[in-house]
Amino acid sequence: MKKFIGLFLLILLIGCTNKMKPTDFKDQKPRLVIENYLSGNVKAWGVLQNRSGKVTRQFKADLNGKWDGSKLILDEVFNWNDGERQTRQWTINKLDEHNYEGTASDVVGTAKGYSYGPAFKFEYVLLVPVKGKNIKITFDDWIFMQDERVAINRATMTKFGIKVAELTVMFVKD
């Protein structure tokens, strides 16, 4: 019983650690305005790592965004190194200077986005196809602008609060 209580307290303590927040970047530059950066053509290259850090897949992607003044329509085409091709269309609405909401056909509910300084955080649950079934994976997705053309993306993927994979992506705007 003492071991169980000790383990519970350790898990509780780990869960209470300070996580990175979008507002941590509010005074940093360059400022990432996601609807500007993703408007037009953007190329991306990424690697998917399993929970132990092993690279399991790689991709190249083409993104094309159109901003109408209040919403961004973002078309993504992923070409994976195993031959799989995936497409996704995001509709991202700007709520105010710092807050966004997004939807896509394989996103459960609504994604929440937060933009401060060079950082954009996107939180959502994605239906990921695995062996013929869709499983719900929670994404903690961060994009960091490096300069006017280059941004780096890190996404942590979890199931039941446990990390199952990480995604690293480099974006280059045409």
Per-region residue spans from a language model:
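Sec-dependent signal peptide recognition
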Residues: K2-L7
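N-terminal helix-cap/turn-to-beta initiation motif at the start of protein domains
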Residues: F25-N41
